[in-house]
Amino acid sequence: MAGTSLGTRFYRQIKRHPGLIPMIGFICLGMGSAGLYLLRLALRSPDVCWDRKNNPEPWNRLSPNDQYKFLAVSTDYKKLKKDRPDF
């Protein structure tokens, strides 16, 4: 057992306990979804600033028509009018 690789040991455990397959599948699905959501937050959120020199306040560049929420149930962003001053 000392010379076996990690993949071989993993395969043996899966072969002995097939009930682990759905659990491993759901764990991988959850980790993948969490990773994709973090990537979406990092790239699309107006609160995240990757370039402080050229864009120190990215939230001031948003127009009222920009939808940055993940899900907007009752708000139609295309009909909103601009009611804030430009900075």
Swiss-Prot record:
Protein name: NADH dehydrogenase [ubiquinone] 1 alpha subcomplex subunit 4-like 2
Family, per entry: Belongs to the complex I NDUFA4 subunit family.
Matching Pfam families: B12D (PF06522)
InterPro entries listed in its UniProt record: B12D
Superkingdom, natural source: Eukaryota
